[in-house]
Amino acid sequence: MSIFRAMKAKIGIITTWFERGAAHVSKAIIDVIKDDFEVYIYARGGEVAANHPSAWTHEHLHWGTTLPYAMKTHVDLPDFKKWLKNTTPDVLLFNEQHSWEVILWLKENSRIPIGAYIDYYTDDSREHFALYDFLICNTRRHKMAFQDHPNAWYIPWGADLSLFSPKKKEVQKKALTFFHNAGMNPYRKGSDLVIQAFASMKEKDCKLIIHAQVGPDVLEATIRHMLDDERITWIQEEVPAPGLYHLGDVYVYPSRLDGIGLSLPEALACGLPAIVPNEGPMNEFVFDGLNGKWVDVARRWKREDGYFWPMNEVKVSALAEAMDEIALDKGQLSLWKDRGISFTQKHLNWHKNAAGLSALLQGVKSNAASAKALDACKNYQGALNPKLTLKMKLHRFLVKIGARKLKRMFTQA
């Protein structure tokens, strides 16, 4: 074998890079392709740096330039071009990229294959994902939304079972502990529903632990007052994987909307049966009576930003009933734990599910985009927030003028 054949291909991943779900997805992808690819990370500018630097270091990590007035996930093109020139990647993967300028530039100026990890898309933006040469879909409903794309890969999400695993069996505690992960957005995660349901349960000999990256002040006052219950603990802390799942017996996750719901496979892998809405993607990981319980959705509505999938909400009374059912039947809980662990090992092993990802990435080709598709995306991007776009252009112009003045000053000196 020649030395050239033995060299690894290079992949550039453009992503959030700190204690957030998107970054954990990027780390999981890196973990399964690192033996086949030399990985370069472009951490988008303007996003928070990691509070746990030991968990967020990387050999080839570049923090992108921050621009004022930039929309979420904006990539500064001058900085990106320099990074691209220095790294010379063979393929690029964008993780939760909402801004389209960099995609448009690549399709018009480069032959590097580009792909997207699918999470956020609206009714209006979905068609523009045709500009990508490949898509990574980790849930069935994402795959369904992009079934017309010729390279939409369905790679079922899971968990790193070497990191997320059940604790050794202990003597059954008297008080059952429900665990809920509120993340950065307690409303979207259904934290208010969990607190109300817990307060209205018939079984009172139980506890509730809520782990969040924000404080309870984000809750409405009526919900916040319920936290005075000494049985409820709110933990505000950024905790690296495997998190705090080991503190609970049952995972309660009435999420109103999720792209994947990363915490579900993690909780299940840690041996916690889960209570979730009977709604995708939550019901792709939890099966009623097998490794948890479904709660019927009471209402659905469209989110203001036009996200493709609707919000959903369960009734507090129905959620409380499901929590009571588990709390009052310890035998069923034990059965669900055992079944859940078995199901997770068989179906939610991320390394097994993503074993073929490297081969797919190595075989991808760049496809030329039509002028019509490029123009449509340009019009969409321009309409997202024209005022911010104008401010960004003005800022870049002023920076350039300032740099010229400084250069003249030093030259004259």
Residue map of PLM features:
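Conserved donor-binding/catalytic core segment of Leloir-type glycosyltransferases
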Residues: 14, 170-189, 195-199, 209
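A charged, aromatic-enriched C-terminal amphipathic alpha-helix characteristic of glycosyltransferases
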Residues: 313-314, 318, 328-361
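Nucleotide-activated donor-binding/catalytic signature segment of Leloir-type glycosyltransferases, i.e.
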Residues: 219-238
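Acidic anion/phosphate-binding donor-loop and adjacent secondary structure
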Residues: 126-127, 158-174
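Aromatic "clamp/platform" in nucleotide-sugar-dependent glycosyltransferases that forms part
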Residues: 256
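Short hydrophobic beta-strand element within catalytic cores of glycosyltransferases
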Residues: 273-276, 286, 293-294
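Donor nucleotide-sugar binding/catalytic pocket of nucleotide-sugar-dependent glycosyltransferases
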Residues: 133-165
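Short alpha-helical donor nucleotide-sugar binding micro-motif in glycosyltransferases
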Residues: 129, 237-238, 243-248
